[in-house]
């Protein structure tokens, strides 16, 4: 639609003339309680201070309003939500694939990568794939998984086993390790 009017997004808080109550519980600029006053008196006080009257909790009886700079309030609110998002760590599941015949050199490289994943706080999924005639030697695959478990959980105390395969699923065995919580 060309040339149409842009709809303003609804504000989460009503301000100044948008407040519909006749009486409000007023809080000052510094957070001090002023008490229950009429809406006109509250608007006058906000105008004297050169800031806005913002309805904080509209469902209260009477509604709670605060005298504050609304633009600054929105900025602080968005800043704090961004800060909270930044602090949240998304735990990823990283996968390393082994084969029953994985050589020692390759095993060490994959083990180093697993250690790095666990130190970064990510979970590690170890997939052991069987091809062709390897299916007849599933005990070799279990030995590889037990070796990984011994190296990471028992010897270095880096991880805890979240799930350990008891049998083969399709043509693979899957073990999941989670990083150990540090005190």
Swiss-Prot record:
GO terms for biological process: ribosome disassembly. It comes from the Bacteria. GO terms for cellular component: cytosol; membrane. Keywords: Cytoplasm, Initiation factor, Protein biosynthesis. Its main location: cytoplasm. InterPro entries: T_IF-3_C_sf, T_IF-3_N_sf, Translation_initiation_fac3_CS, Translation_initiation_fac_3, Translation_initiation_fac_3_C, Translation_initiation_fac_3_N. It is found in: Cytoplasm. GO terms for molecular function: ribosome binding; translation initiation factor activity. HAMAP family: IF_3. PANTHER family: TRANSLATION INITIATION FACTOR IF-3, TRANSLATION INITIATION FACTOR IF-3, MITOCHONDRIAL. This is Translation initiation factor IF-3. It comes from Yersinia pseudotuberculosis serotype O:1b (strain IP 31758). The lineage of its organism: Bacteria, Pseudomonadati, Pseudomonadota, Gammaproteobacteria, Enterobacterales. The gene is infC.
């Amino acid at each position: 639609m060309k040339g149409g009017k842009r709809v303003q997004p609804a504000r989460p808080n009503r301000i100044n003339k948008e407040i519909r109550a006749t009486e409000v519980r007023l809080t000052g600029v510094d957070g001090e309680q002023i008490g229950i006053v009429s809406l006109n008196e509250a608007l006058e006080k906000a105008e004297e201070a050169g800031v806005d009257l913002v309805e904080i909790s509209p469902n209260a009886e009477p509604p709670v309003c605060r005298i504050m700079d609304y633009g600054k309030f929105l900025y602080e609110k968005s800043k704090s939500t961004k800060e909270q998002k930044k602090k949240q760590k998304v735990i990823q599941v990283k996968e390393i694939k082994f084969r029953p015949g994985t050589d020692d050199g390759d095993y060490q490289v994959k083990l180093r990568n697993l250690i790095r994943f666990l130190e970064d706080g990510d979970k590690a999924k170890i997939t052991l794939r069987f091809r062709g005639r390897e299916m007849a030697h599933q005990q070799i695959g279990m030995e590889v998984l037990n070796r990984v478990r011994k190296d990471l959980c028992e010897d270095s105390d880096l991880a805890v086993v979240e799930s350990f395969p008891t049998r083969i699923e399709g043509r693979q065995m899957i073990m999941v390790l989670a990083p150990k919580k540090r005190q």
